Regions:
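Divalent metal-cofactor coordination and adjacent catalytic microenvironments
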Residues: 1-212
Length: 212
């Protein structure tokens, strides 16, 4: 998506703020692709492999999320930094949801404090990727500056069931499930197998480009 500045399209320049660690606090309540839909895609009519296919859906969803740096179904993430940036903290695992955000930091004396969304920082979940930044005429507080001095907890995803996720993303999951269901070894003797080119093409189309 281009940004219009004085009538001239400008390529977006935002990039994810480098972080120390990223942890998934909550797991999705449901998968964005149903078992029935996956079985239909794989052309499976029996129930014997239901548990296996369900596990493939979960693994495929995680793989697509990791590669594209996105969150499909609503998830709470916790990301840690060694210190605050100069201005905005651009958060990973887009799209950010307009839900509660907590920011905790360790000051120079080693004590922990929590910032207030009302007075200390603003949240912008309307852009990709989402970000937080200080309130008007304020700045981030000084931190101790050692590892994991800043912790941000926030929510991301395309809704609780992921149904509003781009269709191309859900189709990527289906392609992986079908491929893994049919090919259960890393390679087939005499005929090495890889994910079909169709998957790579869709993956490139779904990529967020400069945001990764």
């Amino acid at each position: 998506m281009d940004t219009i500045v004085f009538g001239t399209p400008q390529k977006p320049t935002a990039s994810i703020t480098p972080f120390r660690s990223l942890v998934r606090i909550t797991s999705p309540a449901v998968e964005p692709v149903s078992l029935a839909f996956a079985k239909q895609h794989c052309r499976v009519d029996t129930d014997a492999d239901d548990l296996y296919i369900q596990s493939l859906i979960s693994v495929a969803r995680q793989y697509v999320e990791d590669v594209l740096d996105i969150t499909i179904c609503s998830t709470v993430w916790e990301v840690k930094y060694d210190l605050f940036p100069v201005w905005a903290i651009v958060l990973p695992r887009l799209p950010m949801l307009d839900r509660a955000v907590t920011v905790t930091y360790r000051s120079g004396d080693g004590t922990y404090s929590q910032l207030s969304n009302a007075t200390d920082f603003q949240v912008d979940a309307s852009v990709l990727p989402g970000r937080i930044y200080p309130q008007w005429a304020r700045s981030w507080p000084a931190t101790r500056g050692d590892e994991n001095s800043v912790t941000v907890r926030y929510s991301a995803g395309y809704g609780d069931d992921g149904q509003s996720a781009p269709p191309i993303v859900k189709h990527l999951i289906l392609l992986l499930v079908a491929h893994w269901f049919d090919t259960r070894q890393p390679a087939v003797t005499g005929a090495p197998q890889s994910v079909p080119q169709t998957f790579d093409t869709l993956l490139a189309a779904a990529s967020m480009g400069v945001y990764r």
